[in-house]
Design a protein with these regions (language model features):
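Small cysteine-rich, disulfide-bonded extracellular modules of the LU/uPAR three-finger superfamily
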Residues: 1-141, 149-187
Length: 187
């Protein structure tokens, strides 16, 4: 019997850090992209075999998520990509490591799964050596997306414009919580 998944929600938290001191923090509910909800839940729960296009493999950050005043734009839940992607990091099979397009390992992530509570937490840290502009000046971000290998975006969040340079780290905590109407069942 197949279960339809509903109530997939969660929490998004972004921090700009300098020497572990929080310079900026912003939190909001998760924004799960509608067409990928069931695929995401089944992937997290291990109900479908591992395939590159069914597991988290990519994160993109961009600057197209804010209004002129710096406030975040509204999300519809039907987005398919960032409005203006600036950097992209890809998981290439090694646990806890993401790579940029130059093959550099500059971003780390931590997965935490608590299936009894229906939680999946992903923490991504973009350190002070990456995510900056090529000229080592401020780079502004206001949107982030998580993607499967086939480029289906499954989570998207806009946030107030944040400026990152080589003295700061960007920390993103993304928590997904999911339930089925009859508990967890095999498809």
């Amino acid at each position: 019997m197949k279960e339809s998944f509903f109530n997939l929600s969660g929490h998004f938290k972004l921090q700009l850090l300098q020497n572990e001191k929080v310079l900026f923090e912003w939190e909001k509910h998760n924004a799960i992209i509608q067409p990928t909800i069931e695929k995401l839940a089944k992937s997290i729960m291990g109900l479908i075999p591992y395939e590159p296009n069914t597991n988290f493999v990519k994160i993109k950050l961009g600057d197209g998520g804010s209004n002129l005043d710096g406030s975040p734009i509204d999300i519809t839940g039907n987005e398919t990509d960032l409005n203006n992607s600036l950097v992209e990091y890809t998981h290439k099979g090694l646990p806890g490591v993401l790579y940029d397009d130059q093959g550099q390992s500059l971003v780390s992530y931590i997965n935490a799964v608590e299936l009894k509570q229906g939680l999946y937490k992903l923490t991504i840290i973009i350190d002070n050596t990456d995510g900056n502009s090529p000229n080592d000046v401020l780079r502004e971000y206001s949107e982030v997306g998580l993607f499967f290998a086939n480029d289906d975006m499954f989570a998207y969040r806009t946030f107030p414009r944040v400026s990152k340079d080589s003295s700061t780290n960007l920390k993103i905590e993304w928590t997904f919580q999911f339930l089925t109407n009859k508990g967890i069942q095999q498809p």
